[in-house]
């Protein structure tokens, strides 16, 4: 908010109350769109000609080369590969990004591996590659263009808006919010990928993405730290039916802080440094893309706070189940039971980012108290995990240690576990320690696996435990 206000003061004031752009209607520069604390500057969005929004259609039949379609030229749709019996997913980029190639096309191609779909990449680069404040105002025109295309699909081709899914990253999240508002919430689904904070957070619902914009709105927050001083580009405000906050929503694993991120101006980010400066912000669309091919690896846990989630207070999933973050969030039966449902999960730091959550309880056995740490690995019918530290400190016989772990692979049905301990101290008496019982509980369904052993082992020697 503060950054938008500062930038606004540096620009000249534009007079007038509204500007009209033909079939898209008129756009006011008065409240709540402008003249607010978060948006003090009364400027207009650019014209459709200046923004030059393009709709690039990819389908299973043309996964590599787009077909440009236009709402003002319906024949471009009729003679394209657009299929009326398929769902249509629009993907909209954000600030200084583009709609051709890159992550948008990659997301389409992942969709083609799991479904027959019309995938439309929305390119509004000419409207996004300007000062941030102007780009934020331009989102209204881009949203209007999308809404008009959906209306043409409905009136000219009988295609229901309920079959439309709008996906938007950063400023693109508010673009699709505007489109949904103009379609009076009849769009089937909207997904906001780290909706942009500056010029939007705290504003009335008609200005930003909100749950009334679609029949179902899901949001992934990955950069929700305050814009000042942490340069968090994303909203912390909950704006969907389901609001996912992976890793707490502020700092993503694998995104390292750097000195540049503390001094760079949002209007000065250049394309080649996006991953360097905005790593957290970009994680949202990377998580979504990965979820398409890994539907079970992003299970979220409804919880009131990340602290409670980390304390395992929201584990396992309740009887009604847990929602999946990303592509399959709409499979959750309770998705629209209420708005602003808060969901937490942890992810990996690289690769496909997937994780599976378990609660592990270890009961120790041995002759005397030792100090050190204990590790446990899970072995299942789908593979085995790496070793995870369960406890570090005083290791007392009969003591029980509990910890939740986020496992790097889906091991499936757990068949055995392996225990290891170490204190990294040379001991001539070669003491032994073991696990008499290890209980593993799955977060998905609460199922418990119990493993037992009467053995003890020396440090750095694996102990295998089998079902009791």
UniProtKB/Swiss-Prot annotation:
Optimum pH is 7-8 (lipase activity in the presence of bile salts) and 7.0-7.25 (lipase activity in the absence of bile salts). It is a peripheral membrane protein. This is Pancreatic lipase-related protein 2. It comes from Rattus norvegicus (Rat). It is found in: Secreted; Zymogen granule membrane; Cell projection, Neuron projection. SMART domains: LH2 (SM00308). CLPS stimulates triacylglycerol lipase activity. Triacylglycerol lipase activity is not inhibited by increasing bile salt concentration. Glycans are attached at residues 352, 427. The lineage of its organism: Eukaryota, Metazoa, Chordata, Craniata, Vertebrata. It is an enzyme of class 3 (hydrolase). Lipase that primarily hydrolyzes triglycerides and galactosylglycerides. In neonates, may play a major role in pancreatic digestion of dietary fats such as milk fat globules enriched in long-chain triglycerides. Hydrolyzes short-, medium- and long-chain fatty acyls in triglycerides without apparent positional specificity. Can completely deacylate triacylglycerols. When the liver matures and bile salt synthesis increases, likely functions mainly as a galactolipase and monoacylglycerol lipase. Ca(2+) binds at residues 205, 208, 210, 213. Residues 92-104, 256-278 are annotated as: Required for galactolipase activity.
């Amino acid at each position: 908010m503060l950054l938008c206000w500062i930038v606004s003061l540096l620009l000249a004031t534009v007079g007038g109350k509204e500007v009209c752009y033909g079939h898209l209607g008129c756009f006011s520069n008065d409240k709540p769109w402008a003249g607010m604390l978060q948006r003090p500057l009364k400027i207009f969005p650019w014209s459709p000609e200046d923004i030059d929004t393009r709709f690039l259609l990819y389908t299973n039949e043309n996964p590599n080369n787009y077909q440009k379609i236009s709402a003002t030229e319906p024949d471009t749709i009729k003679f394209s590969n657009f299929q009326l019996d398929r769902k249509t997913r629009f993907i909209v980029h954000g600030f200084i990004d583009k709609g051709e190639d890159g992550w948008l096309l990659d997301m389409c191609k992942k969709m083609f591996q799991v479904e027959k779909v019309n995938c439309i990449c929305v390119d509004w680069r000419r409207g996004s590659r300007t000062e941030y404040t102007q780009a934020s105002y331009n989102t209204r025109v881009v949203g209007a263009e999308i809404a008009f295309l959906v209306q043409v699909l409905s009136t000219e081709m009988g295609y229901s808006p309920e079959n439309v899914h709008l996906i938007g990253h950063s400023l693109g999240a508010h673009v699709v919010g505007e489109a949904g508002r103009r379609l009076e919430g009849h769009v089937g689904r909207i997904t906001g990928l780290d909706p942009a904070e500056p010029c939007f957070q705290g504003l009335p619902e008609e200005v930003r993405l909100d749950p009334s914009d679609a029949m179902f709105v899901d949001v992934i927050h990955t950069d929700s730290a305050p814009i000042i001083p942490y340069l968090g580009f994303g909203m912390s405000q909950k704006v969907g039916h389901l609001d996912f906050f992976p890793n707490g929503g502020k700092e993503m694993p694998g995104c390292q802080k750097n000195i540049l991120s503390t001094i760079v101006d949002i209007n000065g980010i250049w394309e080649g440094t996006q991953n360097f400066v905005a790593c957290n912000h970009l994680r949202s669309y990377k998580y979504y893309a990965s979820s398409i091919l890994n539907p079970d690896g992003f299970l979220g846990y409804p919880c009131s706070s990340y602290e409670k989630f980390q304390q395992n207070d929201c584990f396992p999933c309740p009887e009604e189940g847990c929602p999946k973050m990303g592509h399959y969030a709409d499979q959750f039966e309770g998705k629209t039971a209420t708005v602003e449902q808060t969901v937490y999960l942890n992810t990996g730091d690289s690769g496909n980012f997937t994780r599976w959550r378990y609660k592990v309880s270890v009961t120790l056995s041995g002759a005397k108290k030792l100090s050190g740490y204990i590790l446990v690995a899970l072995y299942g019918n789908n593979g085995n995990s790496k070793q995870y530290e369960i406890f570090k400190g005083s290791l007392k016989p009969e003591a029980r240690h509990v910890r939740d772990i986020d496992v790097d692979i889906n091991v499936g049905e757990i068949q055995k576990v392996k225990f290891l301990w170490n204190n990294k101290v040379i001991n001539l008496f070669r003491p032994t320690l073991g696990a008499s019982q290890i209980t593993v509980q799955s977060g998905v369904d609460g199922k418990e696996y119990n493993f037992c052993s009467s053995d003890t082992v020396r440090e750095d020697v694996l102990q295998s435990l089998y079902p009791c």
